[in-house]
Amino acid sequence: MAAPALVEVPGANFDWLNLDTEQGMRIQAGRRGLTLDDINQMSYGVQGRDEAGTNVFSMRGAKADARSPRHARQYHDKGDVWSESAMLLYEEANQRQWSSARDIPWETIKPLPDDIEWAMCTLCTFLTQVEFIAGDLPGRFMEQVHPDHFEAQLFLGTQIMDESRHLDVFRKRCLVNGGGMVDAGFGAIGLLSVDDFTEMTALLHLFGEGFVQTLFRMGELISQNDAEKKIFRLAAQDESRHLAFGVTHLKYVMDTQPWRREELHHYLDLQEGTLGQNQQAGLTTNPMTGEALAILAGGGINKIDEGFQKLMIMRKRQVNEYMHRLEVIGLGDRRDRMGEGFKALLDPIDA
């Protein structure tokens, strides 16, 4: 469509009608509706924008006002924030929102033996802490995404909503059946010292959420009713998106900024070391949470030995799935430099 002709009206200035942006895009909505990927075309698309434009709040494809003040809050290099899956994951997140109030069959929760109830409350107390920090951290980086790469910011917004819902649903589970919150540990407070987008993605998305997702996917093993099964199933669905964003961002970093390899290894060296040394750093090394998981997996405190055997299976799965993601990213050499505690849980490489 041609730009509208300038309309002259005495006393008014309609210079803004002299459009200097690209026009003429016509799109038919598809089976999934009108998606971000559909409009990712012409000068409005992200292709070819490896470096962001001027540091002003002008959205991609729009002409910036020459008077716009500059700022220094945003990442300029696309590789610092980009994920090739950001658009798809954002659309999926919008389509798969759920409500902890309406979509969980809370009526299926019946009184449980004290050891089982308190074990579940212990686990869910820990998870409320984990999810609070997992929602807090992305918010610190949202404003640093340049408008030319806004899809990454949109995805982080959906993650904050997801983590808020997880905190909400695990807190409700603590309080709904005669139990309550238990003594709080430190949680994943080490993540709050993160100072870079890619560092956040490596430690939160790849590492932390990857390990938590493995636990959520084992929800059938530790759940006592349909409500708990659905909680873990829906939470795992959300975590899969966060994890996918992290893996595809880090892969993009390795593809476009290969000189950052040792930087990424350094982040993971620190996190693997922390998980192996700090009892509050993770689900599998926190004694209180580990014992609660063993009680749930075994079916009671009198079957805790059986539960610990199942817990070891989960630990091995966590580490091996973590290693697989590293290989997808392009960090397969991490197998040789992984901490000994982790390396001992790795499956041997097929000959």
Short names for language-model regions:
Residues M1-H149, Q153, G180, E199, ...:
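Terminal targeting/low-complexity segments that flank the catalytic cores of oxidoreductases
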Residues D114, L192-S193, F207:
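Short helix-capping and inter-helix turn/linker motifs at the boundaries of alpha-helical repeat units
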Residues L127-G135, L156-C174, A202-Q213, A235-G246, ...:
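Alpha-helical transition-metal enzyme core signature, strongest for iron centers
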Residues A134-D196:
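Long, hydrophobic, well-ordered secondary-structure blocks that form the structural core
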Residues R173-A188, F197-S223:
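All-alpha helical catalytic cores of prenyl diphosphate-utilizing isoprenoid enzymes
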Residues L215-G276:
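Aromatic-anchored, glycine/proline-accented short structural segments
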